[in-house]
From Swiss-Prot:
<comment type="subunit">
    <text>Homodimer. Heterotetramer of two Top6A and two Top6B chains.</text>
</comment>
<dbReference type="InterPro" id="IPR020568">
    <property type="entry name" value="Ribosomal_Su5_D2-typ_SF"/>
</dbReference>
<dbReference type="GO" id="GO:0003677">
    <property type="term" value="F:DNA binding"/>
</dbReference>
<dbReference type="InterPro" id="IPR036890">
    <property type="entry name" value="HATPase_C_sf"/>
</dbReference>
<dbReference type="InterPro" id="IPR014721">
    <property type="entry name" value="Ribsml_uS5_D2-typ_fold_subgr"/>
</dbReference>
<dbReference type="GO" id="GO:0006265">
    <property type="term" value="P:DNA topological change"/>
</dbReference>
<dbReference type="GO" id="GO:0005524">
    <property type="term" value="F:ATP binding"/>
</dbReference>
<keyword id="KW-0799">Topoisomerase</keyword>
<keyword id="KW-0067">ATP-binding</keyword>
<comment type="similarity">
    <text>Belongs to the TOP6B family.</text>
</comment>
<dbReference type="Pfam" id="PF02518">
    <property type="entry name" value="HATPase_c"/>
</dbReference>
<dbReference type="Pfam" id="PF09239">
    <property type="entry name" value="Topo-VIb_trans"/>
</dbReference>
<dbReference type="InterPro" id="IPR015320">
    <property type="entry name" value="TopoVI_B_transducer"/>
</dbReference>
<keyword id="KW-0547">Nucleotide-binding</keyword>
<feature type="binding site">
    <location>
        <position position="427"/>
    </location>
    <ligand>
        <name>ATP</name>
    </ligand>
</feature>
<protein>
    <recommendedName>
        <fullName>Type 2 DNA topoisomerase 6 subunit B</fullName>
        <ecNumber>5.6.2.2</ecNumber>
    </recommendedName>
</protein>
<feature type="binding site">
    <location>
        <begin position="97"/>
        <end position="98"/>
    </location>
    <ligand>
        <name>ATP</name>
    </ligand>
</feature>
Amino acid sequence: MSAKEKFTSISPAEFFKRNPELAGFSNPARAMYQALRELVENALDATDVHEILPSIKVIIERTSQEKEIYRLTVEDNGIGIPPHVVPDAFGRVLYSSKYVLRQTRGMYGLGVKAAVLYSQMYQDKPIEITTAPLNSKRIYSFKLKIDVTKNEPIIYERGSVNNDTGYHGTSVSMYILGDWMRAKSRVYEYIKRTYIITPYAEFYFKDPEGNVVLYPRLTNKMPVPPKEVKPHPYGVDIELLKNMISRQKEDTTVKEFLVKEFQSVGEKTALSVIEMAGLDPDKRVQKLTDDQLSKLVDAMKNFPDFRPPSPEALSTIGADLIELGLKQTFNPEYVGAVTRRPKAYQGHPFIVEVGLAYGGDIQPSEEPTVLRYANKIPLIYDEKSDVVWKVVEEIDWKRYGIEDEQLPLVVMVHLCSTKVPYKSAGKESIADVEEIEKEIRNGIMEASRSLKTFMTEKRKEEEARKRLLTYLKYIPELARSLSIFVTDGKKELAPKVQEEIQNKMIDLVVTKLNIKDKDLELFKSYRVETL
Ligand SMILES: Nc1ncnc2c1ncn2[C@@H]1O[C@H](COP(=O)(O)OP(=O)(O)OP(=O)(O)O)[C@@H](O)[C@H]1O
């Protein structure tokens, strides 16, 4: 036996190729869904974040009969990608335009590359990208793969043509081993849920069976886009600080550094923080020792008077668009939504939005249907391990007037943040961070109070209607007695008069109470003798 271990290192590309399930590529069905998601989310980030109304086309075609290989294409009308970054954006794991403090769907710089790595494991065609940045005179195209060992793009083809039409946007096609029958319901669910939260987008979807579904744009109103912000002092650590300091000019002082590089820090606040850390405000920041850096971080984390992190970096959907999306999809009897005030955790701002829909076309079931969203991404898998589920499970709906055994209820929760605490790189569930959990609970409770008012009104109306229906039951008997009275007992005249009286009385009550045909049928089924 040898006690010698062999040590080597691997590239990030190699790591995700070896562990595709960490990024959501655990089997062909899931991979199909995940690859589609990554492309659609990039397409949406390239549009609404830049105030472009999204038009997204998704096409899945089967290309091989022997193996289940599919060609997945997603086209957008977004800002496009500068040609010099295309190879790295699609061929270098952990390369992104989204490593800044601003709410976007993308966060890790991994998604599309994880899809490419999965793609090239089971078939040999490269990914194809066609793109034109805004105002570009040319349209660029690339075919590439990833060199897994070096974590670098390998370019197979590149070219460009004139852009005479002012086109801008990106089209990406990739070939992947999939399992359509197993992926189908999740893929459709994903598109439906994406549509609910982006009613200002239009989608065209063609599935591999040839079915085409169009999701029309419901409104031209778009959420206010997020702005990039500086870090908040509560969110720093020693490594981040060192990294930021390494980019400063040599003569930048500690005070200047704090004021220039962080949000919520003016001169006065900077001086108080530096005093708390026991440092000299005029010292050059690059000269701070490790010990001094550690003291500065402690002071920044514990200083009590910073303004909370700026919500400008966030982009909520807003109650009206949430209601629009829910109405369109579920045709409910009741819909309501709230956008909570901004809160913060670990130096990151976050906002919770909650939408509730009840009754109408919603299929009743033992548990409410929960729609989870983070930064406008629908989360479909791993529902039960999500903090949203944990909170929803604890809600006692009876307190809000919902007595049904089977609930016709949809609960939608949207978390916006510059950092969503996902449990994995596949972005399917949110970890239970205390501050977020509390805010989700408060959001659901706030939205439920309006639902309760609606339920109370509805119950009152139902009770009043029931009482009145009971009165209605007496009409035939009353009409009969009156007809005998009016006709002085002339038996041959009585039935006709009785019918006339009865119809008039019914008309009167039906009009007054706005009784629907269904209830009228119910009334007609009553017999005096059953009273
Ligand atoms: N359709 C597109 N339009 C514009 N830019 C795009 C498009 N697709 C990809 N990109 C660029 O490529 C980069 C890398 O995308 P990728 O999916 O790998 O990671 P990400 O979106 O940054 O983060 P995440 O891993 O969280 O999805 C993006 O940050 C974006 O700049």
